[in-house]
């Protein structure tokens, strides 16, 4: 008799296999990072990771700005500002960079907790690239800080880099992620 797949409800107590009809249109839309300096973060996410700025929203009365970054084709975005907001919020897997005004020039500002030191919480986001090793060579040449290079550790072929605020980003490609996870699959 064949073993139940790891994803089956019998192997995952609490798992509901038939989503509630009310959740049919839900998507994973964004992860939010608080950033110290938008100039530095926008450079990293656009130049280093190749993302586009999908939409910027400024809230002067609350003194913060939101920058929505992603891999969408911005030429497809509507030109009407409100329609562009709706378009942005309908895209899958975007990064919302939240800048509280003044942090970039505040010498007392210590930065944000990235979740990877005690107390641990949030860990990282992941970006699929064409070739992990080539991408990491490029990141190295751009001066990006590494947490783990693809040749390090037991999980060969995946890397972790840091963004300017210390958030971790896992870097992998379709081939190496299959090799790395084959014994766990």
From Swiss-Prot:
- Which residue ranges are recorded for the region named Disordered? 1-21
Keyword list (alphabetical) reads:
Lyase, Metal-binding, Zinc
> Molecular function terms in GO for this entry?
lactoylglutathione lyase activity; metal ion binding
Q: Where in this chain does the record put each VOC domain?
A: 27-174
The chemistry this enzyme catalyses reads: (R)-S-lactoylglutathione = methylglyoxal + glutathione
Question: Cofactor note from UniProt?
Answer: Binds 3 zinc ions per subunit, but unlike the enzyme from mammals, shows full activity in the absence of metal ions.
Annotated Zn(2+) binding lies at 30, 96, 124, 170
**Pathway annotation from the record:** Secondary metabolite metabolism; methylglyoxal degradation; (R)-lactate from methylglyoxal: step 1/2
Q: Give the EC number(s) under which this enzyme is classified.
A: 4.4.1.5
| Biological function | Catalyzes the conversion of hemimercaptal, formed from methylglyoxal and glutathione, to S-lactoylglutathione. Active toward the hemithioacetal adducts formed by reacting methylglyoxal or phenylglyoxal with glutathione, homoglutathione or gamma-glutamylcysteine, showing no preference for homoglutathione adducts over glutathione adducts.
List other remarks: Zinc ions may be required for the correct assembly of the enzyme but are not required for catalysis.
User: What's the subunit arrangement here?
Assistant: Homodimer.
User: This chain belongs to which protein, by name?
Assistant: Lactoylglutathione lyase
According to its UniProt entry, this protein's organism is Glycine max (Soybean)
The taxonomic lineage of its organism, from the top, reads:
Eukaryota, Viridiplantae, Streptophyta, Embryophyta, Tracheophyta
């Amino acid at each position: 008799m064949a073993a139940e797949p790891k994803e089956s409800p019998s192997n995952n107590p609490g798992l509901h296999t038939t989503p509630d009809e009310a959740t049919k249109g839900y998507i994973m839309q964004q992860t939010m990072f608080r950033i110290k300096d938008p100039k530095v973060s926008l450079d990293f996410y656009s130049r280093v990771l190749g993302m586009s700025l999908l939409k910027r929203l400024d809230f002067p009365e609350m003194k913060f700005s939101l920058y929505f970054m992603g891999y969408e084709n911005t030429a497809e975005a509507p030109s009407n500002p409100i329609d562009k907001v709706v378009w942005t919020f309908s895209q899958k897997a975007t990064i919302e960079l939240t800048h509280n005004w003044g942090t970039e020039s505040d010498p007392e500002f210590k930065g944000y907790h990235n979740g990877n030191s005690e107390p641990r919480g949030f860990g990282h986001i992941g970006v699929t690239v064409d070739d992990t090793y080539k991408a990491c060579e490029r990141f190295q040449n751009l001066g990006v800080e590494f947490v783990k290079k693809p040749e390090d550790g037991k999980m060969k072929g995946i890397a972790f880099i840091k963004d300017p605020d210390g958030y971790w980003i896992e870097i992998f490609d379709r081939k190496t992620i299959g090799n790395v996870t084959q014994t766990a699959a």
